[in-house]
């Protein structure tokens, strides 16, 4: 706990200092990438322009509207993002000992990005960062799959123009679904377009740090049935400041609510623990690497799920119970914009998060199913659809039961649920 408090103080102090320094700089020029893509792509990094991209004094009417539109549409400040520009080097965010690590995994890699109602500036900055900070020998392609964005937010034409300007037609696979698939099914459809040996699923508002990919590939070489996670750093939704986050495992409670599990200070006093991958009971879901062949072997995501929610729990359980593992690679760092809220809608008339969670519970919890419904009683009466396919995967892979998972992977899950206390 002391480690978390001390690091948080340093991070906060650094942000305050950076903000104070930025306030002394003039307001950045605003170039709108939707209207002038070439001009926006020509913008130099902030370090060269010497301006403040977050300053809200003396905004023009167009700038004010852009800021308000961004917060309403994306739950982050699109004006700050556009003024930040197309390129940013967030530097080396991992522990200094990571610089000494040697990696020899050489899988061709496809980065798979699903976007629905996404801001153009964030996705283009992410693509530029992936291209710049990934070895050419490893990056096979980036799959950009647009899941039926609403009319004002369709990016496919902008992305095609970007690919032509940058000469990336052979590196970017740009596809659009005219009908809303939802994040889960869209990920499956997009992954089927990928031709790399490894797929990296990445949310559409991320930025990679230097040497982000190599640490993700090495554990896969050591165990091909690995799902490998980076450390997810924080990008502020208003200022877009990049801040390193605590190294942590991922977990969940009996209601499948995700949570971070922070490692004790003493763990990191052993130098090698700052660099070596470690097991995690679960995953956040937005950022992960695995062999495409293994993803298919696991039955991909459950195509009976709707929109978003619990797919991370399902994939975690499938990996652990069916002969694989989930690990965190602390030397891999990827920043993620943590938005103010989830700005897109679910399926009308349906609690999709609960629906998906019930499907996972019915498929994987077995004798522990009652613990889930004690936390989520509304789910007990919910119609959850056909489970034939996920059950066939479970049988085909001869998966272990939930008791094994608790005893061998996640003993912290065993305490009684609230209504039994």
From Swiss-Prot:
Where is it located? Answer: Golgi apparatus membrane
**Care to name a GO molecular-function term for this sequence?**
polypeptide N-acetylgalactosaminyltransferase activity
> Which residues participate in Mn(2+) binding?
203, 205, 336
EC number(s): the record gives 2.4.1.-
Q: Primary place of residence?
A: Golgi
Q: Which residues are exposed on the Lumenal face of the membrane?
A: 25-421
Which pathway features in its UniProt record?
Protein modification; protein glycosylation
UniProt-annotated stretches for the region Catalytic subdomain B: 277-339
Keywords, comma-separated and alphabetical = Disulfide bond, Glycoprotein, Glycosyltransferase, Golgi apparatus, Manganese, Membrane, Metal-binding, Signal-anchor, Transferase, Transmembrane, Transmembrane helix
According to the record, which residues are glycosylated?
52, 58
Query: Which intervals of the chain are annotated as region Catalytic subdomain A?
Result: 106-219
Its topology with respect to the membrane?
Answer: Single-pass type II membrane protein
Q: Which family does it belong to?
A: Belongs to the glycosyltransferase 2 family. GalNAc-T subfamily.
Q: What does this protein do?
A: Potential glycopeptide transferase involved in O-linked oligosaccharide biosynthesis. In contrast to other members of the family, it does not act as a peptide transferase that transfers GalNAc onto serine or threonine residue on peptides that have been tested. Some peptide transferase activity is however not excluded, considering that its appropriate peptide substrate may remain unidentified.
Can you say what this protein is called?
Answer: Probable N-acetylgalactosaminyltransferase 8
């Amino acid at each position: 706990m002391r480690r978390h408090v001390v690091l948080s103080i340093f991070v906060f102090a650094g942000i305050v200092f950076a903000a104070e320094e930025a306030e002394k700089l003039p307001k950045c020029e605003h170039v709108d990438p939707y209207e002038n893509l070439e001009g926006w792509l020509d913008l130099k990094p902030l370090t060269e322009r010497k301006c403040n991209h977050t300053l809200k004094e003396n905004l023009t009417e167009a700038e004010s509207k852009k800021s308000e539109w961004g917060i309403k549409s994306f739950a982050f400040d699109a004006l700050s993002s556009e003024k930040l520009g197309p390129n940013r080097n967030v530097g080396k965010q991992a522990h200094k000992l990571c610089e000494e690590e040697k990696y020899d995994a050489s899988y061709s890699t496809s980065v798979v990005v699903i976007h629905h109602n996404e801001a153009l500036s964030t996705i283009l900055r992410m693509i530029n960062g992936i291209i710049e900070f990934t070895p050419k020998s490893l990056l096979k392609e980036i799959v950009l799959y647009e899941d039926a964005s609403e009319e004002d937010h369709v990016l496919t034409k902008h992305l095609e123009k970007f690919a032509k300007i940058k000469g990336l037609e052979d590196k970017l696979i740009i596809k659009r679904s005219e009908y809303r698939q939802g994040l889960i099914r869209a990920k499956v459809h997009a992954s089927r377009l990928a031709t790399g040996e490894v797929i990296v699923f990445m949310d559409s508002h991320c930025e990679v740090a230097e040497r982000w990919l190599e640490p993700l590939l090495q554990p896969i070489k050591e165990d091909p049935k690995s799902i490998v996670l980076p450390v997810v750093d924080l990008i502020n939704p208003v200022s877009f400041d990049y801040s390193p986050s605590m190294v942590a495992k991922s977990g969940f409670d009996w209601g499948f609510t995700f949570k971070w599990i922070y490692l004790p200070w003493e763990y990191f006093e052993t130098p090698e623990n700052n660099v070596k991958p470690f097991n995690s009971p679960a995953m956040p879901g937005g950022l992960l690497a695995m062999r495409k062949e293994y993803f298919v072997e696991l039955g991909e995501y459950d195509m009976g799920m709707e929109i978003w929610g619990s797919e991370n729990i399902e994939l975690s359980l499938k990996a652990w119970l069916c002969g694989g593992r989930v690990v965190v690679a602390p030397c891999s760092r990827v920043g993620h914009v943590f938005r103010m809220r989830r700005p897109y809608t679910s399926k009308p008339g349906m609690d999709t998060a609960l629906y998906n969670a019930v499907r996972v519970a019915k498929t994987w919890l077995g004798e522990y199913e009652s613990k889930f419904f004690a936390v989520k009683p509304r789910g007990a009466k919910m119609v959850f659809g056909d489970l034939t396919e996920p059950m066939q995967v479970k049988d085909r892979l001869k998966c272990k039961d939930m008791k094994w998972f608790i005893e061998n992977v996640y003993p912290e899950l065993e305490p009684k649920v609230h209504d039994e206390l």
